[in-house]
Amino acid sequence: MKTEESNKRLFAIASMIDDHFDSSAPILNSTYGFLKNIQKVALGLDQEDDGPQKVNSLYGDCITISCDASILKNPGGPSAVGFVIDFAKKDQANLSTARFCKASTNNQAEYDAIFFSLSTLIDLCGGANITVPINVISDSLLIIDQLNGVKKCNDENLRHKRDLILELSGSLPASVIFSWKPRNSTPELKQANDMAQNLLGVKNH
């Protein structure tokens, strides 16, 4: 698949997601038919002359997700998340998007960023089709430590969000790694942060 064609498909997917979901609807509640349409666009199956392709053709040896969250008032909200999915393939463009979330604290929003990014990847590729490692990067050391079992999660709301993510990642045949990196330390993390802030009307300098 040529780079130009790949970019067009990913933009089409992002547009489909934006049109289909409102700000509060969990991506995992999307309909089967809608997901099949997303897969067709992603794989080029919407064009008759392309022929069948495997989902694995979308990505390389590892998928990297960089995600971040932003909240105008902590606690209180409103809040938004942004994430960038890098398929580690030269001719495959990154998928980036942002959305509002219902989180009322920064830590809740950071968990939501990870959950929605993983959900989007699974909805796009189909969980059973993802066979390469997934590296999820966040700039929240607390959240990463809680997901990795390094620190306890005493807050009931955060514990529920953590368990949902662990259940989601545990359902995949591929391994999921939760990694910490400092704020804006990579172009992808900065992009994720900028997208979330832009959605909230925060100007980036």
What residue ranges belong to the model's regions?
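Short, basic/hydrophobic alpha-helical segments
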Residues: 112-135, 168
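C-terminal functional segments of enzyme domains
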Residues: 9, 74-77, 133-205
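Short amphipathic alpha-helical heptad-repeat segments
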Residues: 2-18
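Flexible loop/turn and low-complexity linker elements, especially glycine-anchored beta turns
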Residues: 31-51
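RNase H-like nuclease fold core
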Residues: 51-109, 119-123, 202
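Phosphate/oxyanion-binding active-site loops and adjacent basic polyanion-contact surfaces
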Residues: 106-114, 158
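Short coil/turn segments at beta-strand junctions that form active-site/ligand-binding loops
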Residues: 61-62, 128-133, 174
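Charged, low-complexity interaction regions
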Residues: 18-29
